[in-house]
């Protein structure tokens, strides 16, 4: 039986295993034929959306991996707007509204509120937090 999952990522792109475990879990789900309705990045997890992350050449580029996965499987990558702004992750619209020089949110990621997470949770068979 194929299930629909929502993933909640609260860990940063580097420094803990939360985000990388979420990514590997997502890949495994998709390979088994399950569906991911949404990946929601909250708290420190919003750092996964920062396009200015520049890992060493011998390190796994997790933000780019999320983008590739989302592109391949058409998965929304939602980023909590309040958590993102507190941590300096902004899209073009927020950069303009806040009077900032530029944005740093990677493509495929989009700002949204906790309401988007709540809506997704109502339709998913499983919600898994990392």
Swiss-Prot record:
Example GO BP: tRNA wobble position uridine thiolation
InterPro entries: DsrEFH-like, Sulphur_relay_DsrE/F-like, Sulphur_relay_TusD/DsrE
Keywords: Cytoplasm, Transferase, tRNA processing
One Pfam family of this chain: DsrE
Entry GO CC: sulfurtransferase complex
Gene Ontology MF annotations: sulfur carrier activity; sulfurtransferase activity
Coiled-coil stretches noted in the UniProt entry, renumbered to this chain: none
Compartment(s) of residence: Cytoplasm
EC number: 2.8.1.-
Active site residues of this protein: 80 (cysteine persulfide intermediate)
HAMAP family xrefs: Thiourid_synth_D
NCBIfam families in UniProt: PRK00207.1, sulf_tusD_dsrE
PANTHER family per UniProt: PROTEIN YCHN (PTHR34874), SULFURTRANSFERASE TUSD (PTHR34874:SF3)
Function of the molecule: Part of a sulfur-relay system required for 2-thiolation of 5-methylaminomethyl-2-thiouridine (mnm(5)s(2)U) at tRNA wobble positions. Accepts sulfur from TusA and transfers it in turn to TusE.
Quaternary structure (record): Heterohexamer, formed by a dimer of trimers. The hexameric TusBCD complex contains 2 copies each of TusB, TusC and TusD. The TusBCD complex interacts with TusE.
Family: Belongs to the DsrE/TusD family.
Name the UniProt record assigns to this protein: Sulfurtransferase TusD
Originating species: Proteus mirabilis (strain HI4320)
Upper lineage: Bacteria, Pseudomonadati, Pseudomonadota, Gammaproteobacteria, Enterobacterales
